[in-house]
Amino acid sequence: MHPFYQLFRNIQSLGEEEVQELLGPPEDALPLLAGEGLNHRVADALNLQLPTADLEWIHKTNVITGLYSTQTEKFNCNWKQPVFPKIHLDNNLFQKLENYFGPLTTNEKRRLKLVFPARFFPNATKYFPLLKGIKDKYPNYTIEHFFAAANYLWTLWESGILYLRKNQTTLTFRGKPYSWEHRQLEQHNGQQHKSNIRSQQISCMVANSGNLLYTHYHRDKSSNIQTRNLSDNVFKKSKESTRVRCYTYDKIQRNRLGQLARIPCESKAPSEQQQSSLRSKGRDFRNQIQAYNSSRNKGYTTWHSTTSDSIQSGSKKKTHTSNSSFERHTPSFDNEKSDRSPAGICRGTESSNHLRSSQLCLWRSFYYTKPCGTYCLHHIVSSIDDWGPCTFDGDVTIRSPRTPRRITGGIFLVDKNPYNSSESRLVVDFSQFSRGHSRVHWPKFAVPNLQTLANLLSTNLQWLSLDVSAAFYHIPVSPAAVPHFLVGSPGLERFASCMSHDASNRNNSKLQTMHHICSRHLYNTLLLLFKTYGRKLHLLAHPFIMGFRKLPMGVGLSPFLLAQFTSALTSMVRRNFPHCLAFAYMDDLVLGARSYEHLTAVYSHICSVFLDLGIHLNVEKTKWWGHTLHFMGYTINGAGVLPQDKHVHKVTTYLKSIPINQPLDYKICERLTGILNYVAPFTKCGYAALLPLYQAIASHTAFVFSSLYKNWLLSLYGELWPVARQRGVVCSVFADATPTGWGICTTCQLISGTFGFSLPIATAELIAACLARCWTGARLLGTDNSVVLSGKLTSFPWLLACVANWILRGTSFCYVPSADNPADLPSRGLLPALRPLPLLRFRPVTKRISLWAASPPVSTRRPVRVAWASPVQTCEPWIPP
């Protein structure tokens, strides 16, 4: 049926004869549909040009929101934190791939080098304060979201996906180091790397000599000269042998550790500050000793341990007898056993970081202070003696470029997808790299369009879809790019300070301003969160900064690199199994074979290979589809491609809920058009039916749905047609036109005609193509007009574009130069003798897409591997389309 049959019948301004003429033969109706007057009359009848300046716009309809309406996010207190597998691509990835799949092609090597490792060096990076690390997306659940986001980051760190910043030049992580990380290695499994031992020895000797000075100074004043000579010998370039220097270093270390056991715990923090100052070469040791003693005589204590005299005296007596932990009054907040062990002391930087974190520990400060009221956090902290460590150290420590104590993007949590609200997903806002004058121009890669999917996957095969678990986190990132991928948490103290009313005084390092965060809401929330996180609540309350070790999802570079990675894998699979079809889009991989048994054999082989390479497949999401594949929201089988039922139901629901004769703001039109566009290629009129909506969006005006236009859209979207696969055939029908006439040439006849009035050349060419399709039924036409070749009909008059899309549905075009077009003379009113037609063979459109690589034959020289006997006859291997 004609798409405008019912619509023209319902328009009263069109007479009966005019309607019959518009619905009549195409050679008479198509030029009339291109007329400007008819299009204006139909637009007026459909109320598409109603002025809406004096009417109040509607900003929400159904679940679609427009201008001035904010959609509140929903926070789920019972979100499940995802558990990430130990994702680690093998260090010998290229060698293993060659062992399994034979020598890699040039394209495969080029793509894999882009992602192993990934590099990202923008021209400019803006750093934000740590306070913006966790975004307040849920005002009613601020504290809950804060701890959930911090827990998510620590989960990623424990899985080896994030680096933990120790200082501005050091990073630590868990897992196996990659080959490029070995070059910057400082520590691995608690042992110093060879390249770092010498520098660590020098720093330890300098630090130990400073503590030795304190011992000699208090024994005898005359020993001051001896210690100064010893310190001079440490810094001078002595000409002694290596054995003597090693003996001196061991002796200093034994004296250092022996004296350390007798130093009170409260005096450790000043000694660490003295150690950092002693590392400078140009300082006088006598001044340093005097400064140390003066600070000690003043009764210097850290702010977290300022308590009553009885508690202080009791704790000091106990720390003189035990150098491992505070027994009763001091819980082991930061693993003080490891910090005070000989291995922990010699690590200079690491021990100082632990002590610095313990000094700024909010939990420790509340433990020692008196409660300020009923809802003071002291009651929660003092209920448990051992709250666990303040921070963690990873298995590996590496050097890094200068990493500031800032972040480059904020984070927040959302539902994993619209259909799964029980699990959470991390959203990282790295949008600064896509904005401003210094924005990064991301590499472009083509996404397969609908016709390409139909040409490649519309076959009668057995289908299987695979899902790569945490696909982005498979791609490692170079450590040099870490300063651009920084996320973190400001800590509970700073985060809660911003929420309190008296947060104008930000000097939170003083005891008197510590209790201003105590409130009934925070107290009750922490009690509830303790049931979820337990002792980990203390760890999550500390500030930290992390950098991505694997590829984050919030950067425009990530989709491109993931597409290169998966396309290289599918290229190798197709090359080794030419009787199968492998295709990938981002993290979704599909396999196709002619029989279920053969598909099972290929699947088991690929799973074992991917697991050995370190690629984790989500077994729960592996689906066997049979002959009907569900992929990218489409249903694909031998007949063609159709949208899935859930998308059709969504479109129908939204259209039925649209109010009539009420102006909708253009933001609602934008979102509605995005939903309708997904199903538009399967309707009779395609995208051209939405042209009135596009015009309202472009002019930033409201749009009014009339009952006629709404019912017409419902009828269009109620009848969907599949997008069929294109066939490779030889062109046998050609069309051409002039502003006043048209011509058609086939293998056996020449046809020509004239228009009643002059038309634009592009419009005339489109009408000629429509006439050729109607009269010959050919699915392949030759034309010399680039506008018709593009298939984009939205630039033509609205009525003509809708009807032309209906007539030319499923039609392909071949370009023929005007000089070689056999329909050129008939379009000018000349009918010469028939000549042989130019030989133009049409090839189905696959475009240049990065997700599909042409696979050359496998080299014969490759290692012996398991032979998979195919049930398909391989004498003439079947090549997928």
From Swiss-Prot:
The record marks Y68 as: Priming of reverse-transcription by covalently linking the first nucleotide of the (-)DNA. It catalyses: DNA(n) + a 2'-deoxyribonucleoside 5'-triphosphate = DNA(n+1) + diphosphate; Endonucleolytic cleavage to 5'-phosphomonoester. Residues 185-384 are annotated as: Spacer. Its EC number is 2.7.7.7, 2.7.7.49, 3.1.26.4. The keyword Manganese does not apply. Residues 385-726 are annotated as: Polymerase/reverse transcriptase domain (RT). Activated by host HSP70 and HSP40 in vitro to be able to bind the epsilon loop of the pgRNA. Because deletion of the RNase H region renders the protein partly chaperone-independent, the chaperones may be needed indirectly to relieve occlusion of the RNA-binding site by this domain. Inhibited by several reverse-transcriptase inhibitors: Lamivudine, Adefovir and Entecavir. The keyword Lyase does not apply. Residues 263-351 are annotated as: Disordered. Residues 395-636 form the Reverse transcriptase domain. GO terms for biological process: DNA replication; symbiont-mediated suppression of host innate immune response. Mg(2+) binds at D467, D587, D588. Residues 270-279, 287-314 have a biased composition (Polar residues). One of its GO terms (molecular function) is RNA-DNA hybrid ribonuclease activity. Terminal protein domain (TP) is hepadnavirus-specific. Spacer domain is highly variable and separates the TP and RT domains. Polymerase/reverse-transcriptase domain (RT) and ribonuclease H domain (RH) are similar to retrovirus reverse transcriptase/RNase H. Belongs to the hepadnaviridae P protein family. HAMAP family: HBV_DPOL. Multifunctional enzyme that converts the viral RNA genome into dsDNA in viral cytoplasmic capsids. This enzyme displays a DNA polymerase activity that can copy either DNA or RNA templates, and a ribonuclease H (RNase H) activity that cleaves the RNA strand of RNA-DNA heteroduplexes in a partially processive 3'- to 5'-endonucleasic mode. Neo-synthesized pregenomic RNA (pgRNA) are encapsidated together with the P protein, and reverse-transcribed inside the nucleocapsid. This is Protein P.
